[in-house]
Curated annotation (Swiss-Prot):
Coiled coil: none annotated. Belongs to the UTP11 family. This is Probable U3 small nucleolar RNA-associated protein 11. The lineage of its organism: Eukaryota, Viridiplantae, Streptophyta, Embryophyta, Tracheophyta. Its main location: nucleus. The keyword rRNA processing applies. It comes from Arabidopsis thaliana (Mouse-ear cress). Residues 12-23 have a biased composition (Basic and acidic residues).
Length: 228
């Protein structure tokens, strides 16, 4: 009997939809969605209740590391000055490691640029390339002219769209890598200069009137030390 009862067609029970006047509010929330939202809300409320209790029963004289690592300024805790946290030798080692990483990334970008340029060098504008041939007589000149026309016809073959899209994507990637390589080169130069300025020895910054070709960049001169 159960199989016969299941064989009787029944109307499909559809989910309630949002009323026409409230359609701008999106899909109507179902009971299971309300359960998830309510559980999340009550969980957050319980967490806030526990935190409020901890704050209420906290001993203000309880030891905290900020008591020795910070000081009070205008009623607020400020971390102590960390200027002398590292020695000069430790700072030099840290900067050297950073410079090495920047140099490695710069060289990696340069290698990728070379590979992309090598793969795209034969897909550029062929019309700008011109070759000059010298013929001995008119007959040879006609042959050279016919060969040039046939080569130009081959070069003007329409490239498929998918290949053209890949080429455009590769050119955009190449331009982006060139920009990143330029930024990394500038960063490496600046970091190398800062590293040299941290070394011992008297130095001074040259003025623009002391330079042959001033370009706005800082130029330093070190005092020559007598070698023993």
């Amino acid at each position: 009997m159960s199989s016969l009862r299941n064989a009787i067609p029944r109307p499909a029970h559809k989910e309630r939809s949002q009323p026409e006047a409230r359609k701008r509010f999106g899909i109507l929330e179902k009971h299971k969605d309300y359960i998830i939202r309510a559980n999340a809300y009550h969980k957050k409320q319980e967490t806030l209740k526990i935190l409020r209790q901890k704050a209420a029963f906290k001993n203000p004289d309880e030891f905290n590391f900020k008591m020795i690592n910070s000081k009070t300024v205008d009623g607020r805790h400020r971390p102590k000055d960390e200027v002398n946290k590292y020695s000069a030798e430790e700072l030099m080692i840290m900067k050297t490691q950073d410079i090495g990483y920047v140099f490695q990334k710069w060289q990696s970008e340069k290698n990728k640029i070379d590979k992309l340029t090598a793969s795209l060098q034969c897909t550029g504008d062929q019309s700008s390339r011109r070759h000059v041939y010298y013929a001995e007589d008119r007959e040879e000149a006609r042959e050279l002219e016919v060969q040039g026309r046939s080569k130009s016809d081959i070069s003007t073959v329409e490239i498929p769209k998918d290949i053209k899209k890949k080429m455009d994507r590769s050119y955009r990637d190449l331009e982006g890598r060139k920009s990143r390589a330029k930024d990394l080169e500038k960063l490496y130069t600046d970091m190398s200069m800062q590293k040299e300025l941290q070394k011992k020895g008297r130095k001074r910054k040259l003025r623009d009137d002391e330079l042959l070709n001033p370009n706005g960049k800082a130029v330093y001169k070190w005092r020559a030390d007598r070698k023993r």
